[in-house]
A protein has these predicted regions:
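Interdomain hinge/lid region at the active-site interface
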Residues: 62-127
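Glutamate identity and glutamate-enriched acidic tracts
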Residues: 17, 22, 34-37, 94-97, ...
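Internal alpha-helical scaffold of NAD(P)-dependent oxidoreductase catalytic cores
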Residues: 1-76
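Long, positively charged, glycine-interspersed low-complexity recognition regions
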Residues: 131-138
Length: 138
């Protein structure tokens, strides 16, 4: 596991880093702004996308009957605790909007040019992110 420390004015973090390592985790130091931007990209926005994806197609009975592991896995975050989901959107909405803009830009970019080349690059980069046990190795 990775634990993000957001020290105030970058106080001495050695004791906390030592404790985190002793507990078997990896400490990462970031400013609150950096932390909020990052979690918007990898947690809050994906939850929002999962909610939107499910909501957009839930009324198509055939699609719901045919839905299997891909749809299940992609929409899992739609079941996030409701209070937590509202807090994410309320307290980190600006960063979620920035992530959404980047996402839409990427969607548009994928439609242009050599799609196979682009998804090959994406697939290769994504495969290098996790080891065989599913642990993020970056």
């Amino acid at each position: 596991a990775k634990w993000v420390m957001t020290p105030y004015d970058y106080d001495d973090t050695k004791i906390l880093e030592s404790l985190i390592k002793e507990l078997g985790a990896t400490p990462i130091v970031a400013s609150p702004k950096e932390h909020d931007e990052a979690v918007a990209m990898i947690s809050h926005f994906p939850m929002y996308v999962a909610q939107c994806l499910y909501s957009a197609f839930k009324d198509n009975q055939l699609a719901m009957k045919l839905a299997s592991s891909g749809f299940r896995d992609t929409t899992r975050l739609a079941m996030t605790d409701l209070t937590l989901a509202c807090d994410m959107l309320n307290f980190n909405g600006e960063n979620i909007e920035l992530a959404q803009e980047k996402f839409v830009q990427t969607l548009n970019d994928l439609k242009k040019g050599n799609y196979l080349e682009k998804i090959t690059e994406i697939s290769h980069a994504r495969r290098k992110m996790y080891n065989s046990e599913g642990k993020n190795i970056l």
